[in-house]
Amino acid sequence: MSIDFPLGDDLAGYIAEAIAADPSFKGTLEDAEEARRLVDALIALRKHCQLSQVEVAKRMGVRQPTVSGFEKEPSDPKLSTLQRYARALDARLRLVLEVPTLREVPTWHRLSSYRGSARDHQVRVGADKEILMQTNWARHISVRQVEVA
């Protein structure tokens, strides 16, 4: 049995055309690849821990076919499923929020009304990361600095 792609066997060409037709498709594809990498990492950890799918299923409170299906085709795994699977391996799942616009460089703000030298009235607002870390929600997530091209 074979599956015909719209462009034959040229999957890379098909993906390139799909991205050209709908730029949001690239983000969807990247999200799916990231989910697959995460599931692959969980599978590798399960094997490293020498646990069977049956043992993981018992720890998760599901049946083995559920674990098998999750490992084979995680089309869009729920966060709670990923967390339960990780806990079944005595691991903890951590999410990292990447914000490409954050920079480590300090941000400076000049006061709009001043007398005398402007140098005396520059106020350091703080690096974006410092400001983020001062907010309450920042304690609950990790922020990774990403360079913007």
UniProtKB/Swiss-Prot annotation:
**MF-aspect GO terms:** DNA binding; toxin sequestering activity
Query: Quaternary arrangement and interactors, per the entry?
Result: Interacts with SecB-like chaperone Rv1957.
Q: What happens when the gene is disrupted?
A: A triple higB1-higA1-Rv1957 disruption mutant has no visible phenotype. A single deletion in this gene cannot be made, suggesting that it has antitoxin activity.
In the induction comment, the record states:
Induced by hypoxia and probably by the DNA damaging agent mitomycin C. Part of the Rv1954A-higB1-higA1-Rv1957 operon, as well as the higB1 higA1-Rv1957 operon, which is probably the mitomycin-induced operon; the former but not latter operon is autorepressed by HigA1. Induced in persister cells in response to D-cycloserine.
**Which SMART domains has this protein been placed in?**
HTH_XRE
Domain spans labelled HTH cro/C1-type: 42-96
Q: What PROSITE patterns is this protein classified in?
A: HTH_CROC1
What Pfam families would the database entry show? HTH_3
Q: Does the keyword Repressor apply?
A: yes
What is the name listed in the Swiss-Prot or TrEMBL entry for this protein?
Antitoxin HigA1
Q: Which organism is it from?
A: Mycobacterium tuberculosis (strain ATCC 25618 / H37Rv)
Q: Does the keyword Transit peptide apply?
A: no
